[in-house]
Amino acid sequence: MATSSEEMKKDHTFRRYEDGDYINDDMHGNIFQASWSHKCPTYIQRTPPCQGSCPAGEDIRGWLDIVRGIEKPTGDMSMQEYAFRRATDANPFPSMMGRVCPAPCEEGCNRNHVDDFVGINSVEQYIGDTAIENGFSYEAGASTGKKVAVIGGGPAGMAAAYQLRRMGHAATVFEERAELGGMMRYGIPGYRIPREKLAAEINRIVDMGVEVKTNTRVGKDISTDQLEKDFDAVLWALGCWTGRGLPVDGWDGTSNCVDGLTFLEAFNNGRMKVTGQKIVCIGGGDTSIDVVSVARRIGYNAEAGLPEAILNNNETHDQSLADAAVPCDATLTSLFTKDKMFAAEHEITDATEEGVTILDGVMPLEVIVGDDGRATGLKVCDCTMDGMTPVPTEGTERVIEADLIVAAIGQGGDMEGVEDFANDRNLINADKNYQVVDKPGHFVAGDIVRPHLLTTAIGQASVAAESINSYLMAEKMARRPKVDKHHFSLSEKLVEVGLEPDPYDKQSSTGTSEENYAVHNFDDRSEHEIINYDALFLGHFEQVDRNLRAEDVPNSDQVLGHFHERMAGLAEEAAVAEAERCMSCGMCFECDNCVIFCPQDAVYRVKKDQSTTGRYVATDYSKCIGCHICAEVCPTGYIDMGMGE
């Protein structure tokens, strides 16, 4: 028989524990033996795995909940602007990342255990594109009088400049090239990143008051010593612009063997309009996919001469060559099988549709060089992988004909002029706060720390900006949390909606549930814990198909000269519908299950004038019998039976 509410009031405190009760009983499955439990529900915010998997550290659950209408803005702010503000707290490039990020967040999505992941990228693109269409802008913080030099105008540099201006610090960006954007402009083709959208997201940052000095190389046009005199701190966001060559015989010194970055930059800056007749690219990541996809689009024209000529100088092809181009052959080789390649699955599928030949499980052995000193082919063989080491399969050797061989197997830094900052890998060493090791006042972010994703560079820039702020304000560097992301803050939300708790009056109390100076029975563990799918009530969720973006992927007969954007955005209705597929892991999404199924009517909705995101329900502990049905039926894993432990 369950303990009566009157006996519970008499025998227990509000926390529902007994003196000497230190054993954590496993009550899972014992919901009909409720009188055994002295535990009552507590509300726990945890990080969803999408956010835990996001290198930029975005509050993904937060802006999905805004788009779907669960979390609402105050005043007359639109849903679109509110979602934009939440997304750009971490990432000032939602339109770009919604298009080209390989989306590790989607791989980590708990919805994969129900039907299919939430199309996070597609909703992010909707947020970013809508912000551009509506002219949403950023506000700079109140001036601190501090100045920061940002070396590099790519994703890391511009993201850092954005965060620094929000903090009130002056930021000057030094960029070696003629335009800002880094890899987003010079490494990724325009049919994946529309240049007008890129310009809009860059200009929005510049309009915060960021000073820009293009065509300026630090170490050549301005010295490090001068930077240290003129600025209070320096952030190095150089990127990695030196492509790695193939470590096989015949590569070094062969003119028509080039790296993928050289190839893509020549195309993206408008110099290269046609290429070779037979292109072979070695890689398996997104860069290699871009190389072969570009080659298929621009094609071949014999009148252009040797394909490497335009890559090894600063000349520009005449447009007439492109107008008379014919299709070329493009082959991509990868050590890994297709299911293990680093490129996004849809990029591999699209490239195949466009007529690219993909040879997976193949390793390069030798560049075949002709009598004229140019490569005529690439000798390869089948292989298997032992970890990251290829193991050749004997008897499978063959030669792939080629008049241009492109290596897209990684990249390194160009530290000429700033060699004092280089490590033995020609990168820059950083500590956990992205300070340059043994260089006070110098910080670093992006590929020059470790070549990785655009979203990784953006995430590092955010952490580096926080560290710079601490340095400039003479504050102790904060210890980075285990789950180092941008998190929803209930305390900030309460302030936003006018429900800020009262100041603590230091008077005795029967319990915090009776007072308004505390957020009672809530614990934010988002900086320490990621919630797994097995903590959710998955039976709550119906199977719902993803809302897919329309793609303009040409086939092999249509690809020549096809430069239309590949990925169309979702309309508002589809974006909202896709956001509604989010399971809001680790945060209440106001389903009412706990209220409906509580047999004691102990769980109740908070009054509307006191309710907000994360404070939708509460518990009357004088009625709770510890049956933990509320926790069992909570779809999002927001309820733990923790009170009384």
Q: What is each PLM-predicted segment?
A:
Residues V123-A142, N203-K220, G243-T316, D323, ...:
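Glycine-rich dinucleotide-binding loop and its adjacent helix/turn
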Residues D21, Q45-E71, G98-Q125, R166, ...:
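Iron-sulfur cluster-binding cysteine motifs and their immediate structural context
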Residues Q33-S53, F84-A103, G135-I151, R185-Y186, ...:
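Ferredoxin-like iron-sulfur electron-transfer modules
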Residues V291, A445-E475:
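A conserved FAD-binding loop/helix module that cradles the flavin
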Residues A142, K147-A149, A199-V248, E366-K379, ...:
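Feature captures the FAD/FMN-dependent oxidoreductase FAD-binding
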Residues D26-M27, P49-Q51, E58-G75, H113, ...:
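Beta1-alpha1 glycine-rich phosphate/pyrophosphate-binding loop at the start
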Residues F231-A233, A237-G245, L261, G284-D286, ...:
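Glycine-/small-residue-rich beta->alpha transition segments that form the dinucleotide
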Residues S255-I279, V367, D386-L453, G459:
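FAD-site-proximal beta/loop scaffold in flavoenzymes
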